[in-house]
Structure formats: structure tokens, C-alpha cells
Swiss-Prot record:
It comes from Chlamydia trachomatis serovar D (strain ATCC VR-885 / DSM 19411 / UW-3/Cx). HAMAP family: Nuclease_YqgF (MF_00651). One of its GO terms (cellular component) is cytoplasm. PANTHER family: POLYNUCLEOTIDYL TRANSFERASE, RIBONUCLEASE H-LIKE SUPERFAMILY PROTEIN. GO terms for molecular function: nuclease activity. It is an enzyme of class 3 (hydrolase). The keyword Cytoplasm applies. Its main location: cytoplasm. This is Putative pre-16S rRNA nuclease. It holds the Pfam family RuvX. Could be a nuclease involved in processing of the 5'-end of pre-16S rRNA. GO terms for biological process: rRNA 5'-end processing.
């Protein structure tokens, strides 16, 4: 059976300590679209609960977290460990597939796109860049899996 024929819904997540960008795609078209940001909560458990509510609302079958792998393998960031912990919490709370996807430079790419293509200044780029980065992460994942 072709995996693309099953009903699927994907949530792409670009995690930040203040804001979390979100993107969504569902079958049959699987076109990733930015759906906004969620403010990070005071704890990872509260943040996970906020994300789980979106996951349930949209009947998400797979969550794709952007995982900021370091350019040099020796350096891991605190954000990376928070992402891993948050992903594990969501996995526990939902029992759906949670994937950590290499997102190196997706935020920088989103910033460049908003600056050059949209002509937005730094303040105007602040909020949309997170959800655009999540869209780029989800698009990269879907392209690699050829789920369209």
C-alpha cells in the first residue's frame, strides 16, 4: 500500500525559547503552510500540553521537530536538549510519531526570504519568521519522503 494514500496530517515545529513556529500539511495535497506561533510556556511540560492541544485539534499523525544540529558535531546546544525533551513529552502524551529533523540554518533561510522577497524590516520579520522556518522544516521532511 502506498503510504501517501493514507490519511496523514503533519505538524512542523521550529522550537524557540520564546516562540515556537508551526506549520501544517495534510493529505491528499501535503502542502506545508505556516499556521502561526505559540508562545513557549514556563515549563516544557506546559509547552508540550499547548502543542498537544493543537495536535489533537488538527488530528496530526506525525510531528516533525526542527533539530538544530551543530555545524561541528562536538557542540550541542541547550536548545537541542530542550527539543529532545519536548519531543519525548509529546510522544508520551500522544503516542503519535515524533521525528527530529535536521533544520540547520532554516531560521536564517526564513529571515533571508522575509527580508529579500517580502522587504520586511527586522521587527516585521520577528513573528512570521518562526512559522516560515517551521514550513521550511516540514517541506524539507516531506520532500525527502516523497509523500506527495
Amino acid at each position: 500500500m502506498n503510504i501517501a494514500k493514507q490519511q496523514q496530517a503533519f505538524l512542523g515545529i521550529d522550537y524557540g525559547k520564546k516562540r515556537i513556529g508551526l506549520a501544517f500539511a495534510s493529505s491528499p495535497l501535503l502542502i506545508p503552510l505556516p499556521i502561526g506561533n505559540v508562545e513557549a510556556r514556563s515549563s516544557l511540560t506546559l509547552t508540550a500540553q499547548a502543542l498537544v492541544s493543537i495536535i489533537k485539534e488538527r488530528a496530526v499523525t506525525t510531528v516533525v521537530f526542527g533539530n538544530p544540529l551543530p555545524m561541528q558535531k562536538a557542540y550541542a546546544s541547550s536548545v537541542q536538549s530542550e527539543i529532545q525533551e519536548l519531543a519525548a513529552l509529546i510522544q508520551e502524551m500522544t503516542a503519535i510519531e515524533v521525528i527530529l529533523w535536521d533544520e540547520r540554518l532554516s531560521s536564517a533561510q526564513a529571515e533571508r526570504m522575509l527580508k529579500s522577497d517580502c522587504g520586511l524590516n527586522r521587527k516585521q520579520r520577528k513573528n512570521p519568521s518562526d512559522s516560515l522556518a517551521a514550513t521550511l522544516i516540514l517541506s524539507s521532511f516531506l520532500d525527502s519522503r516523497k509523500l506527495y
